[in-house]
Amino acid sequence: MKSLEQSSNKDMLFEVFMARFDILQKNRQSFISIYEGFKKSPQQLIKLLPSFLESMIISAELAAFNVNGFKGTIRLKGLMIVYFATFFIWLDDNTTSLEKTMMALDKNLNHAEKFGKFLSWVILLVILILK
């Protein structure tokens, strides 16, 4: 098995996000109760966005993703979407191994990677057209 440092960015991000879900899993009912509270009072969630953003930046940096500049900002927003999409699967994942969560995270990361490549081409085309 490769060490985390020898893994691809995507593999490292998978490991970082799954570590987060493992932590959530240890206190599953508490986190689900907190989530249910946010559904009743969504304005409370807004107060946590700066902390969540910071935690996403740290997660990205642990996975050796550059989140600086314009491209990094887009990448960070994509990572947040991946995390939230996977979080909603985790809410319904009653397996002890979190296999549904792992499959969803892998699928979401694959989609994000494809979208990122597509977006890079679009940005390149726009730059070439504007020159």
Predicted region positions:
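Short, hydrophobic secondary-structure boundary micro-motifs
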Residues: 32-34, 68-69
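Hydrophobic alpha-helical connector segments
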Residues: 1-33, 40
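Acidic/His metal-coordination segments adjacent to aromatic residues that form catalytic metal sites
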Residues: 2-6, 61-68
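Extended low-complexity intrinsically disordered regions
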Residues: 29, 124-131
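Generic structural signal for well-ordered, non-transmembrane alpha-helical segments
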Residues: 18, 22, 50-53, 106, ...
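Amphipathic alpha-helical packing segments from all-alpha helical-bundle domains
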Residues: 42-65, 73-85
